[in-house]
Regions:
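Transmembrane-helix signature of polytopic, membrane-embedded enzymes
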Residues: 129-152, 187-193
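Polar, glycine-rich mid-to-C-terminal structural blocks
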Residues: 211, 241-291
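Hydrophobic alpha-helical membrane-insertion signals
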Residues: 12-90, 265-274, 292, 339, ...
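Contiguous transmembrane helix-bundle modules in multi-pass membrane proteins
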Residues: 2-4, 9-10, 163-173, 180, ...
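Transmembrane helix irregularities
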Residues: 107, 152, 202-210, 254-256, ...
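Transmembrane-helix signature of membrane-embedded glycosylation machinery that interfaces
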Residues: 129-137, 178-181, 185, 342, ...
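Membrane-interface coil-to-helix junctions
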Residues: 36-129, 148-171, 175, 281-332, ...
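Soluble catalytic regions of membrane-associated enzymes that act on cell-envelope
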Residues: 301-302, 309-322, 326, 460-465, ...
Length: 654
């Protein structure tokens, strides 16, 4: 079978090679991406420190420790008795069987594993974007700049704040997956499809099913496009081979990930997320991306985020109306090149494809804020089992980074052609428009700053300052592009300047989402409550009762966290996304959350706060026998409790 040639680079043969092809080869680029990832996360590897992450500290760390302990003992864990009354391990094994996770567990203490995962995954993000850009015909330095832009793009880097390793494992593999699919369809070789299978298997082994669903959906759209783009629809033999290899790679990826999915298949019907028809449209559209999130692609302060500095407790963004621990920021380079690309790269069929994919992903991310989601909800199989449609935004951010690479490559082609003809760049190429388009982006940002005002409350960062920061970096990118296209700056200087501006720009925002905290030995040391519970007879369960406005014992999340797991203490609830549905119904299923404990708390009219000699206390009246039947012997609360069947047995940190 004849092989299809890669997309041609249209630079003139008369262009100076030293200026069009800089020595940014694969090995150098790979080394730079790795060093940048290691430098970024290095503080988490210091002695006595570990990654800070809201979900990580509430739940993930303890499951990391649980698996490491069981694997170290040579056993395969099947049941977790410590959270939500107990559940099978395969209810959500997380990234336990992911190769990067397993390697980290083999090399490092548990408290360092998540940092290791992030270093490897963000290295692969930059490397994958470099390879994809090269596969699409971009010169090496353009691919390198694009790699920086995606490696540090806001949405994936901001997931670090919660410690969402699964989301990051999937989204950072998107460029590699697209690279292998393109190379496979273009060449007809087996090896690229094997690469696609391995890449997809790594994503699936994260057990982040929702993000993997979005990656598969985007990959399917990409593959169909490529079959037509490379003319395989006119060659039945080549078409059949490519389709067979494509489906075979997906099947092989699921086979590699079957350690997770085969046991999980039988659990779906027992899960709160496995209800026939899902949990309804309102549940599925919860945590939709707000329309203001579109502006956050340029100015993350505009939509805000509900994150704080864990050390100072000061807000790091203006308050968000909902619950938001991430940002949509893609950086000034990507936004300026998006505007420039409309004028210069529109004829590129790949640019138009990724523009369409970005629009599709954005319309999905907006969820319930657009009527289009009802169409997706009805037409796309399995979508009704998910919530938080804003998770698909990583596909949009990825698409925008690819579009930036294609636009920059087009500018490089026009610049080389104008130099070869020995005429001014402005004469026929129209490159002078780059300056005016960039200045238009800067002017829009300055206008936004004038209209934005300050933070929503005292002590919050200013929205106006966010607009001005974007204006400054957009101005820097515009100046660099103008100097380069006007032949006042060489390609080496342009590559260094654009890469440096992009790295600095994204680093400033990303760093708000990266923090470290005390290492496990100090952070998770046994407190007085644990010391008391360890002296009590077992088996029994503990209910860490969340009281609004007060912290939860054990550094837990809204349901108490999984801190007691370290000491073999079983809980009524904990931190877990997919407990047994029958247990959830027993303690009280929620509408927006998995559980609201209404059965254990009792009727709404029996709940309240009363004044006692010790201050305010919580009154509740659970249904008779429910606590006893659940073997709940102790309730841990940060506020006094008023109930005739309870007596205080310990008072200390809770």
């Amino acid at each position: 079978m004849a092989k299809t040639a890669p997309p041609p680079r249209r630079a003139s043969a008369l262009a100076a090679p030293a200026d069009t092809e800089l020595p940014m080869r694969f090995g150098i680029a790979a080394a730079v991406f790795f060093v940048l990832a290691l430098l970024y996360f290095f503080p988490s590897f210091l002695p006595g420190r570990q990654m800070y992450g809201t979900d990580y500290l509430a739940g993930s760390y303890f499951f990391y420790d649980f698996f490491a302990d069981r694997f170290g003992a040579g056993t395969l864990p099947k049941w977790v008795p410590y959270v939500y009354g107990g559940m099978p391990v395969y209810a959500n094994p997380g990234s336990a069987y992911h190769p990067v996770h397993l390697l980290g567990e083999a090399l490092l203490p548990t408290g360092k594993v998540i940092g290791f995962i992030f270093v490897v995954q963000f290295w692969l993000a930059g490397l994958g974007m470099y390879l994809l850009a090269r596969e699409l015909g971009c010169r090496a330095w353009v691919a390198f700049v694009a790699g920086i832009a995606f490696q540090f793009t806001g949405v994936t880097m901001s997931w670090v704040y919660a410690g969402h390793d699964g989301r990051i494992m999937v989204s950072t593999m998107a460029p590699l997956f697209f690279h292998f699919l393109h190379r496979g369809v273009r060449t007809g070789s087996v090896a690229p499809f094997a690469g696609a299978a391995a890449t997809l298997a790594f994503a699936l082994l994260s057990f982040q099913i929702q993000n993997s669903y979005y990656l598969l959906l985007a990959g399917f759209i990409w593959a169909v496009f490529l079959l037509f783009r490379h003319g395989l629809h006119r060659r039945p033999g080549a078409l059949g081979k490519a389709v067979a290899l494509g489906f075979g790679s997906v099947a092989f990826a699921f086979l590699l990930a079957s350690v997770n999915f085969l046991p999980f298949r039988d659990y779906v019907g027992e899960s709160p997320r496995g209800m026939q028809g899902g949990r309804g449209y309102e549940y599925s559209t919860s945590y939709s991306m707000p329309p203001a999130g579109l502006l956050s692609m340029a100015v993350p302060e505009q939509a805000g985020a509900s994150i704080i500095d864990p050390d100072t407790q000061q807000p790091l963004f203006p308050a968000n109306a909902g619950f938001k621990l991430h940002t949509e920021y893609v950086g000034a380079l990507v936004m300026v090149l998006l505007a420039v690309g409309v004028a210069f790269a529109w004829r590129n069929v790949y640019w138009r494809f990724f523009a369409g994919l970005a629009v599709f992903a954005l319309s999905m991310a907006l969820g319930g804020n657009t009527p289009l989601y009802r169409l997706y909800y009805a037409a796309l199989p399995g979508l009704n089992r998910f919530r938080a449609p804003d998770l698909v935004y990583f596909v949009a951010a990825f698409s925008l980074a690819v579009m930036a690479a294609l636009t920059l490559e087009r500018l490089a082609e026009l610049r080389a052609a104008s130099a070869a003809r020995r005429i001014g760049a402005a004469d026929e190429s129209g490159l002078q428009k780059v300056l005016w388009i960039g200045l238009g982006v800067v002017a829009f940002a300055v206008l936004g700053s004038m209209m934005a005002g300050g933070g929503a409350a005292a002590g919050e960062p200013s929205r106006a300052a966010g607009w001005m920061r974007f204006a400054i970096f957009a101005g820097g990118v515009t100046a660099a592009l103008w100097a380069w296209t006007a032949h006042k700056l060489g390609s080496l200087g342009a590559a260094a300047l654009l890469a440096g501006l992009t790295l600095t720009d994204l680093w400033i925002i990303d760093r708000r989402f990266f923090h470290t905290t005390d290492g496990p030995a100090q952070a998770f040391a046994a407190d007085d409550v644990v010391a008391f519970l360890e002296t009590q007879p077992r088996p029994s369960r503990v209910w860490a009762l969340s009281v609004p406005g007060l912290p939860v014992w054990g550094r837990g999340g809204s349901k108490g966290g999984d801190y007691p797991m370290l000491f073999g203490i079983e809980q009524v609830a904990g931190e877990h996304p997919n407990p047994l549905q029958r247990w959830v119904e027993y303690i009280g299923a929620g509408t927006q959350e998995i559980t609201d404990f209404h059965n254990l708390l009792g009727p709404q009219d029996s709940l309240g706060v009363v004044q006692t000699q010790e201050g305010q206390a919580l009154v509740f009246n659970p249904r008779p026998g429910l606590l006893e039947a659940a073997n709940v012997r102790y309730i841990v609360s940060m506020a006094p409790l008023v109930h005739p069947g309870l007596r205080e047995v310990h008072r200390g940190s809770a």
